[in-house]
Amino acid sequence: MYFLLSPAKSLNETDTAPMDISSYYSQPELIEHSQALMKILKSKEPIDLQELMSISDDLSQLNAKRNQDWAWSDNELFTDDNAKPAGYLFDGDVYTGLDMYNMDKDTAIYVNEHLGILSGLYGVLKPLDFIQPYRLEMGTKLKNERGDNLYEFWGEEVTKIINKRMADSDDKVLINLASNEYFKAVKKKALNAEIITPRFEDEKNGQYKVISFYAKKARGLMVKYAADNKLTNAEQLKQFDLAGYYYCETASDDKTWTFRRDEVNQ
């Protein structure tokens, strides 16, 4: 069983990542491909980024500086002095739910072995891969050597990595907790796995529907639940009960598992 999450645009650059698992920190597996993309990004002025990414002037200035500061080579690897593990750098609703800062060593190692974080710049990351701050959403139409967008750039590479990481998995099930924008980067027909997509619905005025803020946090919570309980197969996820959610069989099918939360528990 292997989980996929989207990254976050908001980053936590202040809190220090725990050092008791520093021996598990690693370099991104597709970093040489990241270099090719960063070469393109470094050539762009703030005004170019503002137009490309539809961001404010302040954000374009910030990310232009991040791009210029970004550096990786065989002689200049990411370290805890110039980078931070992805699972601790990414912030926002999903990562509030995942809550890696409060995990013990064994739980963080489980997450590292069972979770891939899709990324516009890094392809797919382990949570304990060092990365430097960036902004590049998967849906960005950044022309590159492989095509007009990042889906053309990453598709095959990301899919190969996911298949490799799932090779030793007992049940060959991919739990897709990523957004549509990011999961679109995966070539589904080339995956050697069954795909299950959890859906989180909250009750509002007697109706159950996906509420983005709650659903994002629930995605992180589901990975946390699997890690806390050291789950070994997908079927065990049906017992997921954090934050008041429960599996709803009548609203589920083989490919989409629906978890609901009643209004009284929100």
UniProtKB/Swiss-Prot annotation:
Disulfide bonds: none annotated. GO terms for cellular component: cytosol. GO terms for biological process: response to hydroperoxide. InterPro entries: YaaA (IPR005583). It comes from the Bacteria. Belongs to the UPF0246 family. PANTHER family: PEROXIDE STRESS RESISTANCE PROTEIN YAAA (PTHR30283:SF4), PEROXIDE STRESS RESPONSE PROTEIN YAAA (PTHR30283). NCBIfam families: PRK02101.1-3 (NF002542). HAMAP family: UPF0246. This is UPF0246 protein Pcryo_0542.
